[in-house]
Amino acid sequence: MPRIRGIPGPYRFFFTSFDCGEPPHVHVEREDKTCKFWLEPLGLVRSHGFDAHELNRIRRLLRVHLTAILETWYEHCDKR
């Protein structure tokens, strides 16, 4: 399960090898909350437990780190 490192804050950003058959996306967790964002274009797929304010914060973090996240995605998924 590739984890995206270097993004500040209390969140865990990751995807799984099983995700490589889908368009690029990332899962985000914090405590018992989870959400999934498509990366191209950036958009929320689903959320469980995060409020709108926190989802906006996550979206901003994704925008700032989008290039690094996509590089990690393609590096992992293109090797499969």
Where are these regions (language model features)?
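A short, structured beta-strand/loop element
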Residues: 14-52
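Short, intrinsically disordered low-complexity segments
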Residues: 2-4, 45, 56-58
